[in-house]
From Swiss-Prot:
NCBIfam families: ruvA. Residues 142-190 are annotated as: Domain III. Its main location: cytoplasm. The lineage of its organism: Bacteria, Pseudomonadati, Pseudomonadota, Betaproteobacteria, Burkholderiales. Has three domains with a flexible linker between the domains II and III and assumes an 'L' shape. Domain III is highly mobile and contacts RuvB. GO terms for biological process: DNA recombination; DNA repair. Belongs to the RuvA family. This is Holliday junction branch migration complex subunit RuvA. Homotetramer. Forms an RuvA(8)-RuvB(12)-Holliday junction (HJ) complex. HJ DNA is sandwiched between 2 RuvA tetramers; dsDNA enters through RuvA and exits via RuvB. An RuvB hexamer assembles on each DNA strand where it exits the tetramer. Each RuvB hexamer is contacted by two RuvA subunits (via domain III) on 2 adjacent RuvB subunits; this complex drives branch migration. In the full resolvosome a probable DNA-RuvA(4)-RuvB(12)-RuvC(2) complex forms which resolves the HJ. Residues 65-137 are annotated as: Domain II.
Length: 190
């Protein structure tokens, strides 16, 4: 599975971006919240990803934070909600707004998202209740390759996105990968 993509931002056409990685351009679909926070064309970009393989397509979805990716993964587990619908939900409202709507059982807020009807909104509320809050408690934007590498290493070691994000948030921004992993593991062991 492809967990992260880093490279030069070659094109931006909502909701799709093209990331050039050593001469190979990868098309990545991103929610609008991530799209608006992307750097300018030609600048370096790093996105956490979710890779979807279907019979007729292979699609890479990109996210600016581990929290956003975790919410996407929770959404696509719901019957009747595919990756495109999940992307639409995350484009129409922030992860925090979604978590709030789920906590307060506000279907009306979710129905405002294009492509989401009353039944789908109610199913989202029912199936996300108690699940979404655990992953949404902390949002960490990955601002450097070393932070992204630390986050990926912690997730690969079996820690949840939330626990890895909490550990990463406590680290100094300019820490190296190996030192960062060691400190994060010590913090997680407590």
């Amino acid at each position: 599975m492809i967990g992260r993509i880093s490279g030069q931002l070659a094109e931006k056409n909502p909701p799709e971006v093209l990331v050039d990685c050593n001469g190979v351009g990868y098309e990545v679909l991103v929610p609008m919240s991530t799209f608006y926070n992307l750097p300018g064309l030609g600048e370096k970009v790093s996105l956490l990803t979710h890779f979807v393989v279907r019979e007729d397509a292979q699609i890479l979805y990109g996210f600016g934070s581990a929290t956003e990716r975790a919410a996407f993964r929770q959404l696509i587990k719901i019957s009747g909600v595919g990756p495109r619908t999940a992307l639409s939900v995350l484009s129409g409202m922030s992860v925090e707004e979604l978590a709030q709507a789920v906590t307060h059982q506000e279907a009306g807020r979710i129905i405002k998202v294009p492509g989401i009807g009353k039944k789908t909104a109610e199913r989202l509320l029912l199936e996300l209740k108690g699940k979404l809050g655990a992953d949404i408690g902390v949002q960490v934007s990955v601002s450097s390759d070393s932070q992204s590498d630390i986050l990926q290493a912690l997730v690969a070691l079996g820690y949840s996105d939330r626990d890895a994000a909490l550990a990463l948030k406590a680290l100094p921004k300019d820490i190296g990968v190996s030192d960062g992993i060691k400190l994060a593991l010590k913090a997680l062991a407590k």
